[in-house]
Amino acid sequence: MEIEEIKVQTEVNGAPFIIETGYFAKQANGAVIVRQGDTAVLVAAVMSEEPQADIDFLPLTVEYREKYYAYGKIPGGFVKREGKPTDREILVARNIDRPIRPLFPKGFYNDIVITAYTLSADDKYDPDVLGIVGASAALHISDIPFEGPIAGVRVCRVNGEFIVNPTYQQKAQADIEIVVAGSKDAIVMVEGGAKEVPEEDILEAMMFGHQEIKKLIELQEELRLKCGKEKIQVAIDEEEIILKDKLKEFSYEKIKEAFKITDKKQRNKTINAIFEEAFKTLEIPEEKIKKASFIYKDIVSNVMRDNILNEGIRIDGRKPEEIRPIWIKVGVFPRNHGSAIFTRGQTQAFVTVTLGSLSEGQIEESIEAGEVMKRFMLHYNFPPFSTGEAKPPRATSRREIGHGNLAERALEPLIPPEEEFPYAIRVVSDILESNGSTSMATVCGGSLALFDAGVPMKKHVAGIAMGLIKAEDKFVILSDILGDEDHLGDMDFKVAGTRDGVTSIQMDIKVKGLTKEILEKALQQARDGRNYILDLMYQAIPEPRKEVSPYAPTVTTLRVLPDKIPIIIGPAGKNIKKIIEETKVKIDLDPEGLVKIYATSKEAAEKAVSMINELILDVEVGEVYMGKVTRVEDYGAFVELLPGRLSLLHVSQITGERLKSAKEKIKVGDVLKVKVSEIDDQGRIKVSLKDVPENVEPKNKFLFKEE
């Protein structure tokens, strides 16, 4: 059996970058393996035989999975196989989906499934951007109609220099980290974060990445020349064109009037009524009603776009750069550690902050870092009632995970380090109303709630979503877009940051690419809008509260010798469990000797400190201790004073009487009050029972309260 291996190769960041095909997954419409270093990602693209009926969207599904075998591990836990997708896998799948989705032809409704597996992972190169290149390459060499290719790269800036597809080590040192995807002529997707970097630097990073993207596109073109299949043609529906002309003639002006209604619900109700009227007047057959509704949606979109492009009038009457009215309230409920309501027009986020011990952080496992503890978390929830829909709540969606990650990345650079603020921090954003920009409302509400919680952030962070309406060479950038402007427009460009620079950025488009001019204007307009919002946020709460909530745990820090940590824990955790049960505190122990006590009251913290200090006591000559007898011989008994610290009670030191054997008076398990009489050069302890003074409290009495 002969199998042809087809390979093309270039170099990225000093490492070979290879795309290969021909010897695997041959029943898929297209399949490739993309390699950089020892990291390899398989991507397969499959198309259904027939299109779906009665839909007006592209049924594209992207799945990305990081196989444990790729980095030489067996899954932990009882079930030894990969489970549901992790948050990271979902986020990478979204990054693969977003740049390819705009590049399928209009009217193409066949199911497309893109599956990406990380087959091998080294300790240098992140496989996520290889998945973007692989998805494009698999589609490009297949017979699936795809108006690509595109490519994706990660751009980082380390010590002032831009690097494409950096190693993990380089990425950790970067002040800019973005994933950029683009075609030969323009950028189609951006996702990433920065440490308060000026917009000009972000744009420079995008353009730098685009130069490398062109090289990877040439590589895909070379691969297609070697093995590309003939593309299927998408049929033009002549009947649809006729129906569109009729609907447009009947409804265009009426829809234009409806767009003068600024209330979203009333406007949509009127637009729906116009369609019902058109359906009856034009006598559209029942079997074509679904198709007619999709065509009508396009006409509605065109009316909105024409109003903005030609008259500068938006759906709610605002100018292109105008931001909706903002209302802010902080400290909403007393029992939340921090809370805020951020309302912008018909978009509202209720955001809370909860502080906890460091051990309450999220444990995550990834190819990059293995198992790590994440102390700052942001969770975004989008209930159906926020849009007035009568639907039951569902499991967390990919969209919710993506929006939460975007907002988390925006706030994280301003979160103080663990040494300064030793708490795990959980931010939760519940969207109460939605009409566009809910993730950016989450950023603003999150910053306000963190200030309210007393988290010592140096600055507020705000976010704004920008839109675009583009027709040929004419375009208008929209600030603070509505939901309809997002759905019917050409771009959703979210930018978050402080007054000093950008911390998070995300761009999705529905056209085939954006020029540098459009990106530059969008970033500038976003900065102006962000600064306006920040002014209002500083008016609401100008600085973080001086103290955390009385209902939040206080942190008391102790420094002990590292060899005392096992003593604090005790056998099978006995000692630390006892402290926690009696004081209701939480305790984090560091192997280096740092002890953090999280308590909800000053008294509980003081009691826990006292109990720990008693535990780590050093045995001193002349002091009185309690001890448990662990062994008895004729010549004496062995008494444990502290965990692991045995002493000898000689038979002559038990009573004033002469005893033949210690067993006459003492048995294993007895708890005795003894006085330390001697500690020799080797640390061996001798104690006396007969010389114990009356009315003296043992220094380690705490250990024996239950005895």
Curated annotation (Swiss-Prot):
Its EC number is 2.7.7.8. One of its GO terms (molecular function) is polyribonucleotide nucleotidyltransferase activity. It is found in: Cytoplasm. It comes from the Bacteria. It is an enzyme of class 2 (transferase). GO terms for cellular component: cytosol. Mg(2+) binds at D486, D492. SMART domains: KH (SM00322), S1 (SM00316). Residues 622-690 form the S1 motif domain. Its main location: cytoplasm. Keywords: Cytoplasm, Magnesium, Metal-binding, Nucleotidyltransferase, RNA-binding, Transferase. Its cofactor is Mg(2+). It catalyses: RNA(n+1) + phosphate = RNA(n) + a ribonucleoside 5'-diphosphate. Involved in mRNA degradation. Catalyzes the phosphorolysis of single-stranded polyribonucleotides processively in the 3'- to 5'-direction. NCBIfam families: polynuc_phos (TIGR03591), PRK11824.1 (NF008805). Belongs to the polyribonucleotide nucleotidyltransferase family. This is Polyribonucleotide nucleotidyltransferase. It comes from Sulfurihydrogenibium azorense (strain DSM 15241 / OCM 825 / Az-Fu1). The gene is pnp.
